[in-house]
Amino acid sequence: MSIEVSQLTRFFGRAPAVHQLDMSVPGGAVTGLVGPNGAGKTTLLLMLAALLAPDSGTIRVAGLDPVTQPREVHRAVGWMPDAFGTWDSLTCTEILLTFAAAQGMNADAARPRALEMLSLVHLEEMARTPARVLSRGQKQRLGLARALIHAPTVLLLDEPAAGMDPRSRADLRALLRDLASGGTTILLSSHILSEMEEMVDGVVFMSHGTAVASPPGWGEAPGPAGPGAPAPLRMQRTWRMRALDAGRLGQWAHSAQLPVTAEQDGAVRLPVADDATAARLLRGAVDAGVEVVSFAPLSGTLEETYLALEGERR
């Protein structure tokens, strides 16, 4: 269930918030939406969620048109805005039951589903607590439960980790990865690029309402792309490998013809496209007799790319 966007445009007055945007987001993956304030990210998400009409262009969300099929899109999409926005006097359970009813869920099925979602986001102890006493991070978790109440096939998340503590952010990453592996299409916007880097399969860079051209060294993420619609950019992350014997590590990297960069302590850095490639490299090193001490991705690749792109556009 993918997302396809073609020549999408939306004006506010004379100012284009989104301008002739082409984009294709594959199903069963987590795709990040990255850009500065005012780039059009939230406007795009609102149009995808059938909450804002475009001025021109076409959108398909799970094969549905948000303009002509808004109710069907609302059933297929789980929408989590960056602000909670709900009735503070209602309890967490009552809020989820209200949204379940709005989605047409049977009352007998809605209550156990609501309790299941509260448990999923670790708010089961707050089931009877009014929303007004929740912290910002707890409200974010409740917002995620609300977006998931009707088991959507597409998730649209605007700053989902805002206000969350480190444990909650780690839980969010794990949950989104599990949902994607089950086939859910996830598109999320965030300014916390270090967090996004840990969970996304691909990235769409936006600036001035449109998608930015591919940065050097980045490739298209796997998955079908619509005609003329660029796919998200695949994360080509840099990993660091360290071994007990730096010489043997270097020999293995040379014999395997890997494009590595050696560090002063004998560790090496090398580009890794995905987890499967990382597993293959680790297995190859161990099979070659390299006693690997550590092998992990370096953070900051996404932020460096974002800053470089913004620097070029200025």
Identify the residue ranges that each predicted region occupies.
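Catalytic Walker B motif of ABC-type/P-loop ATPase nucleotide-binding domains
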Residues: 155-159
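Conserved ABC transporter NBD signature motif
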Residues: 57-65, 72-73
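Short, charged/small-residue-rich alpha-helical element at the C-terminal edge
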Residues: 223-229, 234-309
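Conserved catalytic motifs of ABC-family nucleotide-binding domains
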Residues: 151
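Conserved ABC ATPase "signature" region
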Residues: 97, 101, 108-126
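Helix-to-loop junction immediately C-terminal to a conserved catalytic motif
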Residues: 49
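Conserved ABC ATPase signature
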Residues: 130-134
